[in-house]
């Protein structure tokens, strides 16, 4: 998560510095939005139902207007989810399992100004998904009254990852001169690695 925050900060800094340097060519727009991704039917890494329905995170976009009607846009998205559970398998034995998913996407594409308040865009790029899971069986033994000792009897870890083509389409609405509302769909991959995402954000037009 720390690396993602650094990437977002760099993305924002570049947006702010590039726009003034080329102000004669047009305006810049920076948006930050809520990002929700629905993963495909992934096999469980921990021997049971993954329990993961959606990954949630953040999306940032920078738009630069080349002319009054045409512009370009870049996008960076990150979403994650973690699920864990513990079940009692005996009088003093337990089974723990967890699954963690991460999704990162980078895209760019053209923007078309449809009207004074509405713009439409389409982008393409790459997305990287990573899933890691772990299981552990352990036993609890009472050493002294009130003190329990946990002893691991079995442990297993596994991970899988996939990089695929990503695409997105959306609109940006200007309810005010410097305010932007961003709504978009994002998809990537196919089969078990197919994802569908939804983005809603707000931003500022420089």
Curated annotation (Swiss-Prot):
Coiled coil regions, renumbered to chain: none
Query: Which keywords label this protein?
Result: Host cell outer membrane, Host membrane, Membrane, Signal, Transmembrane, Transmembrane beta strand
**What superkingdom does the record give?**
Viruses
Q: Which SUPFAM superfamilies does the UniProt record give? A: OMPA-like
Looking up InterPro entries in the UniProt record yields: Bact_OM_Invasion-Related, Enterovir_OMP, OMP/PagP_b-brl
- The answer on whether this UniProt entry bears the keyword Membrane reads yes
Q: Where in the cell is it found?
A: Host cell outer membrane
User: What is one GO cellular-component annotation here?
Assistant: host cell plasma membrane
Its biological purpose is as follows: Incorporated into the outer membrane of the host during infection. Lom is expressed during lysogeny in E.coli.
PANTHER family registered for this protein in UniProt: OUTER MEMBRANE PROTEIN PAGN, OUTER MEMBRANE PROTEIN PAGN-RELATED
This chain belongs to the protein called: Outer membrane protein lom
The scientific name of the source species is Escherichia phage lambda (Bacteriophage lambda)
Lineage, highest ranks first: Viruses, Duplodnaviria, Heunggongvirae, Uroviricota, Caudoviricetes
By which gene is this protein encoded? lom
